[in-house]
A protein has these predicted regions:
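Membrane-interface "cap" regions at the ends of multi-pass membrane proteins
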Residues: 1-63, 209-215, 234-241, 434-443
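Hydrophobic, membrane-embedded alpha-helices of multi-pass small-molecule transporters
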Residues: 33-49, 189-194, 203-264, 278-299, ...
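Hydrophobic transmembrane alpha-helices that form the core helical bundles
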Residues: 107-141, 295-311
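Transmembrane alpha-helical segments of multi-pass small-molecule transport proteins
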Residues: 111-112, 138-164, 178-188, 210-226, ...
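Membrane-interface loop-to-helix entry segments
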Residues: 130, 149, 153-191, 205, ...
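C-terminal membrane-solvent junction of multi-pass transporters and transport-like membrane proteins
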Residues: 358-429, 434, 438-443
Length: 443
């Protein structure tokens, strides 16, 4: 009896250690919506949202900046819920879902793109972390730490949880979100106590930001995360758990830090969040917030990259893929990819956003029946129509992106990434309905 019990325990431990990167997450391993929403909230609480909120606070009056944040976050929540629904129904990662869209070989190209861009974004965010941590240490203790060293330390820290997969990220999020809320709450309370409420109603001190531009900034900063939401959504106990967790996670996660930064920037009359914390006498909380905010967000970037590369390198263990990818991305940060922040953001959103429109249209409106793991190896090597729509939608994003980063030919929603998502969704629906039956007959 003891031997059987031990064997059962070993199997249970082995199952709990798996991340199911190339197969559906089993039903008995799936999670409830609350813990999943904390993961998405933790991802949304990052330095990018903090600095966006500070920019909005300085460029808009209080009511307009809050309105833009709420509208943008609702749109993100809806897109994230839609994409997470597909992840929960299939139990598969974004990269694995792409096999139904692009074919078994075509999906490898898409997975390489997802992996490379996620790695690059990991490097950018590590650089972001290093730059702000450098400022914090310089102001607090007068120590001028090299950016390369801070990037290296930050990269290894953020890699540590991604190596162990979703459940490690979940534990980090469950512990870090309450801590972040407490320390950020202390900062807001201290700022109001020090400055009073009159400051938040003061006229703007920078060039005004139009409402449309503000909404586009709120959406653009997080839309790639919504496209990759099946990576988390596949762990949901039911599709409704995924939809609920994604909407709450993206709405609260994206808006929380932005709204906090709006208030702090108006109270303190500066858009430098690191200096705001230090000016309030909150040096240690500043370091904790900087660390946890980037750690919880950026570990997910590496996690998504490793899931993408797991589809390409199918015989290599995911942990090894994560370690190699994490080291490479950390080196990118050490050598200054952070300096290319805006250019890289434009490229990644143009290429990745259409993929979300493609797989949601294909699953919801074209051919849901083919999204079965049992038949995935019988897929064609190439599904040309989806590859063509992806390329055209990416070009469409560049057409709506203002010069010099894009062609600037016209505007749709003022958010090129959202333009690409909508365009890909509509075109994939139309083309898919026209051609999918012919594909089945030929197959």
């Amino acid at each position: 009896m003891g031997t059987l019990s031990e064997a059962s325990q070993v199997k249970s431990n082995e199952a709990s250690a798996q991340d199911f990167e190339r197969e559906p997450v089993p039903a008995h391993m799936r999670k409830k919506w609350l813990s999943m929403s904390l993961v998405w909230i933790a991802i949304g609480i990052d330095l990018s949202a903090m600095f966006l909120g500070a920019e909005l606070g300085n460029g808009m009056n209080l009511s307009d900046s809050l309105t833009a944040t709420v509208i943008g976050s609702v749109i993100l929540g809806l897109i994230g819920a839609l994409c997470a629904f597909v992840g929960a129904k299939t139990g598969l990662s974004t990269a694995m879902i792409s096999r139904f869209l692009f074919g078994n070989v075509g999906a490898r190209i898409v997975s390489i793109v997802l992996g490379i861009f996620s790695l690059g974004w990991f490097g950018v965010q590590v650089g972001f972390f290093a730059s702000n941590m450098h400022t914090a240490f310089d102001k607090l203790v007068g120590v001028d730490l090299p950016l390369g060293l801070l990037s290296f330390i930050g990269g290894l820290l953020m890699m540590s949880t991604a190596i162990w997969g979703y459940r490690s990220i979940e534990r980090l999020s469950v512990w870090s979100v309450p801590l972040l809320v407490i320390f950020i709450g202390i900062a807001v309370f201290t700022a109001f106590k020090t400055k009073g409420t009159a400051a938040i109603w003061q006229p703007i001190s920078a060039s005004p930001i139009p409402m449309g531009t503000a909404i586009s900034l709120v959406i653009g900063i997080f839309i790639v995360g919504t496209v990759l939401s099946p990576d988390i959504g596949r762990w949901a106990r039911t599709p409704m758990h995924a939809v609920t967790a994604a909407f709450i996670g993206f709405f609260v996660g994206n808006s929380f830090m932005t709204v906090i930064a709006i208030f702090l920037s108006r109270l303190m009359d500066t858009d430098d969040l690191t200096n705001i914390f230090i000016a309030l006498g909150l040096g240690l909380p500043a370091i904790i917030v900087l660390t946890l905010a980037q750690w919880t967000t950026n570990t997910n970037n590496l996690y998504s990259a490793s899931l993408g590369f797991s589809v390409v390198f199918q015989r290599v263990p995911k942990k090894l893929i994560t370690i190699i990818a994490g080291i490479l991305a950390t080196l990118l940060a050490v050598f200054g990819i952070y300096d290319k922040f805006l250019s890289f953001l434009n490229v990644i959103t143009s290429f990745v956003s259409p993929i979300g429109g493609l797989y949601t249209a294909e699953y919801l409106l074209v051919n849901r029946a083919k999204f079965t793991f049992e038949g995935i190896d019988r897929n064609k090597n190439w599904i040309i129509r989806s590859l063509i729509v992806w390329v055209v939608a990416t070009l469409f994003a560049y057409m709506t992106t203002p010069a010099p980063d894009g062609f600037g030919l016209f505007q749709l929603t003022r958010v090129p990434a959202l333009d690409a998502f909508i365009f890909a969704f509509i075109v994939q629906w139309i083309v898919g309905k026209l051609l999918s039956k012919k594909e089945e007959q030929k197959g």
